[in-house]
Amino acid sequence: MPKMKTHKGAAKRFKKTGKGKIKRRKAFKSHILTKKTPKRKRNLRKPTVMKNKAEEKRIKRLLP
């Protein structure tokens, strides 16, 4: 069986942590930022770990 290919679109958006969890960037941080509070924008800067197990499983399949 041939080697699995990495899904490049997913590889640019998600990273695997040391324990195998999926790390992602938060949405709503690219434009229309004037009405958002500084606290909200600061919290959007931090990466987060995926909580949805079904989505996490699907992403892991794209990142062998």
Curated annotation (Swiss-Prot):
It comes from the Bacteria. Keywords: Ribonucleoprotein, Ribosomal protein. InterPro entries: Ribosomal_bL35 (IPR001706), Ribosomal_bL35-like (IPR021137), Ribosomal_bL35_CS (IPR018265), Ribosomal_bL35_sf (IPR037229). The keyword Ribosomal protein applies. Residues 1-45 have a biased composition (Basic residues). Signal peptide: none annotated. SUPFAM superfamilies: L35p-like (SSF143034). The keyword DNA repair does not apply. Residues 1-64 are annotated as: Disordered. GO terms for biological process: translation. One of its GO terms (molecular function) is structural constituent of ribosome. Disulfide bonds: none annotated. GO terms for cellular component: large ribosomal subunit. PANTHER family: 54S RIBOSOMAL PROTEIN BL35M (PTHR33343), LARGE RIBOSOMAL SUBUNIT PROTEIN BL35M (PTHR33343:SF1). Belongs to the bacterial ribosomal protein bL35 family. This is Large ribosomal subunit protein bL35. It comes from Natranaerobius thermophilus (strain ATCC BAA-1301 / DSM 18059 / JW/NM-WN-LF).
